[in-house]
Amino acid sequence: MSEIDQPALTSYQGELRGQRHRTQVLIVGGGPVGLALSIELGWRGIHSILVDRRDGLIPLPKMNGVSARTMEFCRRWGISDAVRDAGWPQDYPVRMVYATSVRGHEFFRYDRGTATNRLQSNNTPEHFQRCPQTWFDPLLREHSKRMSTNTLRYHTKLERFKDVGAQVEGEVIDLLSGTYQTIEADFMVACDGGKSGVRSQLGIATDGNALLSREVNVYFECSDVYAGCEERRAVMTWLVGCSGVWGAVSSIDGRALWRLWLTNMPEDFDAEDFDARRAVCDALGADVDFKITGVLAWDRQQLVARKFSKGRVFLCGDAVHSLTPTGGFGMNTGIQDAVDLGWKLAASLNGWGGAYLLESYEQERRPVAVRNVDEATHTFSLISSLPALECLSDEDQLGLDARRKMGEILKNEQFKREFQNEGIVLGYRYDPSPICIPESSVPAPDFVMSYHQTARPGSRAPHAWLSEGRSIIDLFGRGFVLLDFAQSKTTVDALVSAAKTRKVPLEVVHIGPSHQDLYEARLVLVRPDGHVAWRGESLPGDAMKLIDQVRGAFDQQIAISVPEVYNAPPLKVSIR
């Protein structure tokens, strides 16, 4: 029987087939999202067992960019320096090139300096960092393993599971020994990818487009890509030919590892019959020595799950949103899921989370997933809509004119949204949210390429430096934090008492008026994930009601409207 068709596990089966283990959270999937969740839970003192059918090695990295927001999480976990020092050359140019091939005709480039001298945002203490999955995953794995709360079990496959009401029972098999074991957990979280078996077993459907285009990645080693043309060195070279965009070459490690991506492969594409060497030669525009290390066929998708949970089982990462890699939102969106769910699971397990706190996970994260999935598709549509210019590679005047025309098209500021997207990275907000107190102020525009810091409830609490090397966001994480921006300390005994009664962790921090203009209120309550829950000039009359709402304890469920994913072929943006 298939994994989906197998009967639900009974306690009797579990006892017969192997040993039983108990934990608070069972995590299925050991990619970056599953590992991030294990770290987030461990950081909060929650015990977890992570199972993954693979060996934990990353032969073919799918991601190589860690966003500023993910770096902020890494900062809280204590590993941001390790990510920065993982190995990416600090003097490597942050450059995007558009050309007929790596060594062919170039018609446009974006230069943004290097990791050490590029223009940095004032909106965050951390910044985007190139760190391929071959470095990032092992870094997360080792950090997770150091936590006494965490158990990582590779070569271990979830065979079946059952939500029995008070807990989840998962039967797993050790693929090396063939032995079965039962893991009992208060909750289970599936971080098992776009083809999530757990999502299928739960019967949760997806909305969107399952096949925007068929793609292939060719991974290769080459130390001579830019030999003799160092001025062309780039993190990515978009390949544009007579029929438009046909692929891109990107650096994986800033040295000798590369990925060639090719788009719009035929539906019957067979990677085994594919001439990868010819494709690499065409992309490089020169016959240089290189070694193919892998070929990976994949489908570009635009999907969001209709539900993010069922009972005691939750879904994170690609299991609930599959998006085009353009813009680098995939893994980073998944890690945001893990952080949002992580503090809510911890609150529930520690006894202070209300009945509706875990339901707010889907209500907050699904709109962000729809937003990011659609933006990734839109950005890819923008690039793929570059016109087909037949003479683009010609050496005559017609070719020169065609390349000039393409260069003029690429001057459109919208093409920068692929890598200039701080609004997407930092500007996502939980508005509306049942556990954030709404206010009548006008929300800031939700731009892609620019970001205006705001402390409006639901938003990420703004960054500001308190002292050398210490950001205001370094105050957030363990529990709720009440920021007091008044000249003299405000009396907030009612809120402190209410939080103590409900066993909600709360710290009051007197900042003073220096950053009140940024937060636009005298008092601001920040959640454990660093998002604003409430703000005001004084405490509300009923402090207990405020505490109950932000911990998800209401008289009845609060309905939240969730947008639908754009369920159609991607928009073709006219830029001609």
At which residue positions do the language-model features occur?
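Extreme N-terminal leader/targeting segments of oxidoreductases
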Residues: M1-V25, E40-R44
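C-terminal helical "tail/cap" subdomain of flavin- and related membrane-associated enzymes
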Residues: S2-D5, A346-S459, W465, R470, ...
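Core beta-strand elements of the Rossmann-like FAD/NAD(P) dinucleotide-binding domain
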Residues: H21-T23, S177-F187
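Conserved mid-domain beta->alpha element of the FAD-binding
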Residues: G29-I39, G45, L140, A190, ...
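Glycine-rich FAD pyrophosphate-binding loop
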Residues: G42-M63
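Active-site-adjacent segment of FAD-dependent monooxygenases/related oxidoreductases
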Residues: P59-H143
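Conserved FAD-binding catalytic core of PHBH/FMO-like flavoproteins
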Residues: D81, E142, E169, F187-R300
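A conserved short coil-to-beta-strand element within the FAD-binding core of flavoproteins
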Residues: Y154-V168
